[in-house]
């Protein structure tokens, strides 16, 4: 979308970093395959795709190996613009990566770092991670994101609520009796078993994606439709939620795992039968 709409600067470059020992060309092929899979045919443009692919380079690197950060340094040596580091990795590696980037002296006041949820396993670990990030980045340099907010349906919620007079005047407790949010997936873990089993649906989906949806649905109209105004109203919703007690968990919560079944005429293995699964796992896939 950004490439097609001309929102990317001509000098923008993208460096993919992972342990897989493949060439830049092989990595680019993976990107093309992903675009073909996830971009609808009506929007897919070969010329736009080729332009995007030319921006992409690849670096094979073990983020746990301090010596490998010199490979990243070499790959970035010709870059002159400020760099944003997108950490799509387990949160327990955030500090390791920050230490590694700092060791090759490429972090500046213009650097930015992007971290995705879940940021930690619980409140204590989340605070610890944020403290570690602040060793190298100021608050204005840190972007904590939830990719779910980029979905078209979620984006449309704000327009539906606040730019449509038909709904904006009726979207209140007098007209709405209750709210039910269902987030149903058409796929299973799809190769993410190693990550997901240590997180579970409550941490992976409920405390991030679902709470974000709840905030957008329940918040009051912000005084300004900008980042600060929307964030402020979301916080008010979260502070107004009734804390969950042990009795609530006992009486009102159901946890489960999906079993062998069929999705869109395709047979799918149950959670405990997925590739790499631990048959003794009690991690929830349904809440």
Per-range role (PLM):
Residues 1-115, 119-287:
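Secretory/organelle targeting and membrane-embedding segments
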């Amino acid at each position: 979308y950004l490439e097609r709409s001309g929102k990317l600067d001509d000098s923008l470059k993208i460096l993919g970093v992972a342990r897989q020992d493949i060439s830049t060309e092989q990595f680019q092929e993976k990107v093309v395959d992903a675009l073909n899979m996830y971009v609808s045919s009506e929007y897919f443009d070969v010329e736009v795709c080729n332009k995007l692919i030319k921006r992409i380079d690849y670096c094979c690197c073990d983020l746990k190996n301090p010596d490998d950060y010199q490979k990243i340094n070499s790959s970035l040596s010709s870059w002159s613009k400020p760099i944003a580091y997108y950490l799509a990795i387990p949160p327990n590696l955030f500090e390791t990566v920050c230490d590694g980037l700092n060791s090759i002296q490429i972090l500046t006041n213009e650097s930015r770092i992007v971290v995705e949820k879940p940021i930690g396993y619980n409140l204590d670990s989340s605070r610890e991670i944020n403290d570690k990030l602040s060793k190298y980045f100021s608050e204005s340099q840190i972007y904590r994101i939830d990719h779910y907010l980029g979905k078209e349906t979620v984006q449309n919620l704000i327009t539906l609520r606040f730019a449509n007079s038909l709904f904006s005047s009726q979207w209140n407790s007098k007209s709405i009796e209750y709210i039910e949010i269902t987030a149903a997936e058409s796929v299973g873990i799809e190769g993410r078993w190693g990550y997901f089993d240590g997180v579970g649906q409550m941490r992976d989906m409920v405390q991030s994606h679902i709470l974000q949806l709840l905030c957008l649905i329940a918040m009051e109209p912000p005084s300004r439709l900008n980042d600060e105004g929307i964030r402020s109203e979301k916080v008010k919703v979260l502070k107004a939620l009734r804390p969950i007690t042990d009795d609530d968990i006992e009486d009102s919560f159901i946890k489960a795992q999906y079993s062998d079944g069929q999705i869109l005429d395709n047979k799918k293995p149950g959670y405990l039968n997925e590739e790499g699964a631990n048959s003794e796992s009690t991690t929830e896939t349904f809440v």
